[in-house]
Structures are given as C-alpha cells and as structure tokens.
C-alpha cells in the first residue's frame, strides 16, 4: 500500500511538473509588447533613442503626411519638435518609405530598427501608419501622453519586423443609443482603435432607447426621439448634429478607420416611432424605451409612409459617410404587431 501511494504521488508530481513547464519558458519577445502580435519579429542587440535632434525622413508626400501626424503625437509627450526632412537622412532618424516591391499586402509594412536608424517601409500610407503605430508601442507607454512627460528615456529595442493583418475587416460596434457618448469621448476611442490597427468603426445610431443622429427632414427624431425619462424622472438624451458626424468621420479617416453607420430597422425603432407614431401599426403615442429587452412596437411594414420615411432618412445619412457599407440592423423584430395589422397582412398576401 505504501509503495502504491509513493507511485501515485510520483506520477502526480510528474504530471504537475509537465503542466507547469510551459509557464517557465521565455515569454514571446520578453519586454516587447506589440498588439496585435506582428507576423514576424526578431529582437536584435541594442536600442534606438529618440532625442530632440531626431528627424523624420519622408520619401513621398504621403509619407510626409504620416510623419506630420506622428511628429505631433511625439511632441505632445516628449516636448521634442522633430523636424521632417524630404532629403534622405542616414542616422538619428525615422525613415518612412513607400516601396511597391515589398512582399506584404496594402496594410502591411516592415520595420527595421538599429541603434542609428529606424526604417519603416510599406506599399501605402496606411501601411506606414500601422508601422508607426508599432513604433509607438515599442517606445515607453508614456509616449501616448497628451502632456509632456519628463525623465523618460525614449528608447525602443532594435528589432526587425515584417507584418500585415490576417483579417481585412477588424472592427468594433459602438452603441451610443442606450448610453450617449459625446464626440470627444468617441475621438479618444478612435485613437485607441488606431493604436491597435482596428480599421472599421460600426456606429449604432438608432435604437428603442434613443435616436442619435440629426435628420433635417424629420426634426422630431431628435427633438423627441433622442430623449427619454429615466427611472428617477430625469430627462436623459443627446444626439449628434450632421456637422459633428462629419467631424467624427474626418477624425476616423485621418486614422485609416472607416465609419459604418447603422440605422436600425425594422425593429429597435421605438425612438423613431415615439417621434412619428404614424410609422407604427397602431399609431399610439409612445415614448423611447427606458429598459432593455425587445420592443414589440416596430416599423409598420404595411404603410407606404414607412418606406418613404426610411428612404428620406437614408438619403440624408449616406452622404455623411463615404465608406462602402451602410448597416440596416435587421435583428430582433417581433412579428406581433404585423400579425394583427390589416395593412401588413395585405402586403404579405400581395407580395
């Protein structure tokens, strides 16, 4: 029995040791934290130091635009006003080069950092932008500060990186309908998305709980539909003017982020119906929803007014967003009202 116990204990210890051993291995490029993980990264000896005399070298006007963007960011945290040269610089410089012969896709780049020069190459300005975002992550985290930070050695490790995204679409969806998010906060989020090379921003602009985009042809959408009374009797609301929408889109575009607007239909439409009751099957007087869940009152599919309204709204929204996609929701639409609505039933029979 004693022998059996010792054998079992030994086996258990061996199993435990085998489970533990991976955690004792050297972490991926210890001390280098780049998100997302580059396709290939080799850490070399030494480091490159950014100083007040460091320059950007921009090989093309596109590269100069990227250099200008990041020179401003670097100045915010370091206080260094880095010069941008259109003539080749061989040392103490960050070189941004367009190279159509690179074996990467249009969002890919290479980054080669020695103790004298950082060279970033890409086929496009977008690739250079992502290469610079990697460089920013290689520097101390304080580089993202919006105020000058003193006492920091602005160094990055000597590395050789080749990178391109695995997925063409890399996005998030933001819902400012249930909880309104001011423009300045959205800009901060876009900055973070750009840092992590996210390229799609899905903006959920309408919901049961609030309509958040100005539509000039239908002013009640924001006069009524953007506001709700919370459980304590306090009015809660907010919306984006069309000028603010343009401002956010321009801000995102400058960070190579495409903005996809969403006008939810045929469900999740109580805020719009509260503003224009004739858009529903019952035409009752309603208010934007103050709780979560699925609302039974949806756009009436039997009324021509509904389709005219949606066409008008989309006609105003589309020009504000130059991207390829327009999102119309389509989820969670109860059929309760349609089943009892003569106009909806008539349309169903005829189509």
Segments from the language model and where they lie:
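A general secondary-structure junction signal
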Residues: 86-88, 98-100, 207, 263-265, ...
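Aromatic- and carboxylate-enriched substrate-binding clefts and catalytic-loop regions
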Residues: 284-292, 329-351
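Charged, low-complexity intrinsically disordered tails and linkers
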Residues: 20-34, 309-330
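Feature activates predominantly on carbohydrate-active enzymes
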Residues: 102-325, 341
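Sec-dependent signal peptide recognition
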Residues: 2-9
